[in-house]
């Protein structure tokens, strides 16, 4: 079998002209024997892109409870102190129920939120500063609100009674949530567009010709300030930032954890659409639970030492999402994570969280078999990676990791090469 795999690996990946300048790493592992059936540069480090989310999902399944911890609610004599836990689902449009918001509404005492458990930055190390306006790079913080995004909408309709031949259309532009921040209008164009200033919550709206259009734009979080401003408008009352005196007074007082969404529901969304925000905040939630502070560098070291001590090649793990080009993992590292995941979690749960061919970010992958692959892709400029579980023609599930770095082809071409190789197994 190894010789046959080697032959097809050379045909579709290693010696293919489209990948002539690329670095390719391949690992195929049989979990039933715990042996590799094929390796090619499997011990080399590669930029994994969103394959990092496999590691984050593993850590979340191992360390987060069944329902996500949203905040610690500590009731004092004259106030309520809230300790945020990094939950990305609070008031996120993905979810209909928000237990913490209901608590806020019913509270009769003044509400205060502590901000002394945040020990990292809004933008991750190695993230592209040019992408500040893109919805896939929302800022991280201790208490996300609305996914730290403003959803903008444009609706156009035909006027019933136009005043001039040119004035035939009504255009309505609005946001969710509504904001009181600065807004200006730019030059109209074919496509609706919203551009935020890089260092300010100032949004420039350009009307498009579409009948309906939408765009999500990250807002600057300013720690807790921006989110609490939006929350005040939605809640109808303020949640203030706690001072040191109140924090000290609360010491020794017990609080209760307010839970939010089902963990696996969030992880499925994270894996299906490769949601960077959910991934990075999941890592910060783990950090808050285990270290009592949100610090991705510290929790990464803790996880490598504790849960991922069997990794054969020490990775350079930087964030939860894979947005950072500083991340480096080997294919053999990914195999260990996949193997541990399958050993520790129910197979049905893995199949629910991981997309299969034709679903999510694997929707372009196709195969006649009902089950062929459950995996996570990852791509950046010059990078395509795919790791997960593949069903061979002989009906055996194998762990696999394929990492392609520094290619000069388009992603679609590389993806098809990887797909052809996997279908040959």
Q: Can you say where each PLM-predicted feature lies in the sequence?
A:
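Beta-lactamase-like hydrolase cores
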Residues: 1-45, 64-66, 103-109, 424
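Small-residue-rich helix-loop
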Residues: 37-39, 258, 283-425
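Active/ligand-binding-proximal structured segments within catalytic/core domains
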Residues: 46-60
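Conserved serine DD-peptidase/penicillin-binding transpeptidase domain
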Residues: 62-313
